[in-house]
């Protein structure tokens, strides 16, 4: 998925579906392009529901946007996050097992790169499903759309937790920490604004970082 999400002049949501090709030499410039429109001093205002915009549309466009961001950020770490270096998807003592409720119903232990591979394929399938993410303006969202969004965002948070816990030194070496921090703060403010990720249960592995970012 490589698109960007905006409100046009009529305050209608423009949603784009990303490309499945994540490995590309321009990923760093793509990250900078993605981040360029996000100013750290206006993130709290940026996550609020704009007047006249349907909340499900707002959830949909931001979910796709956050997925784009974490996909690009993780792409910078693929040479460091391997089956050997990260045989279990975790954030410290917290292990994240994979299940999608459809093809894999029983949570299973997987490596971090395998977890992210499963996640990307699963999210793309969800977003491509027009019964969940309708593509045309005015088409109704399913009554339980917020539940789909919560599931996606909860799993995206786990990738952030793994990156911060296991790969922050590589992020610093790549000089990408400002981009990572801006994306993560944007994500945190959004999920906190609409209570989409359980702070006590899901955010415990990096609780102090979460609290610091939300207090800034």
Curated annotation (Swiss-Prot):
GO terms for molecular function: metal ion binding. GO terms for cellular component: nucleus. SUPFAM superfamilies: Mob1/phocein (SSF101152). Its main location: nucleus. Coiled coil: none annotated. Disulfide bonds: none annotated. Keywords: Metal-binding, Nucleus, Zinc. Belongs to the MOB1/phocein family. This is MOB kinase activator-like 2A. It comes from Arabidopsis thaliana (Mouse-ear cress). The lineage of its organism: Eukaryota, Viridiplantae, Streptophyta, Embryophyta, Tracheophyta.
């Amino acid at each position: 998925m490589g698109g960007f999400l905006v409100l046009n002049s009529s305050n209608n949501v423009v949603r784009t579906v990303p490309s499945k090709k994540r490995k590309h030499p321009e990923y760093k410039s793509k990250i900078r392009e993605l981040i360029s429109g996000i100013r750290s001093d206006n993130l709290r205002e940026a996550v609020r529901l704009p007047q006249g915009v349907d909340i499900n549309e707002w959830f949909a466009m931001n979910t796709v946007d956050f997925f784009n961001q974490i996909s690009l950020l993780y792409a910078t770490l693929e040479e460091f996050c391997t089956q050997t270096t990260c045989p279990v998807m975790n954030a410290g003592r917290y292990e994240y097992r994979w299940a999608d409720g459809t093809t894999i119903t029983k949570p299973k232990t997987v490596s971090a790169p395998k977890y992210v591979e499963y996640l990307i394929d699963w999210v793309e399938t969800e977003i491509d499903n027009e019964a969940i993410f309708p593509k045309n303006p005015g088409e109704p969202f399913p009554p339980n759309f917020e539940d789909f969004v919560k599931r996606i965002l909860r799993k995206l948070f786990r990738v952030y937790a793994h990156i911060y816990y296991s790969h922050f030194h590589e992020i610093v070496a790549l000089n990408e920490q400002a981009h990572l921090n801006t994306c993560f703060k944007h994500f945190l403010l959004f999920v906190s604004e609409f209570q989409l990720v359980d702070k006590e249960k899901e955010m415990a592995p990096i609780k102090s970082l979460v609290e610091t970012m939300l207090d800034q």
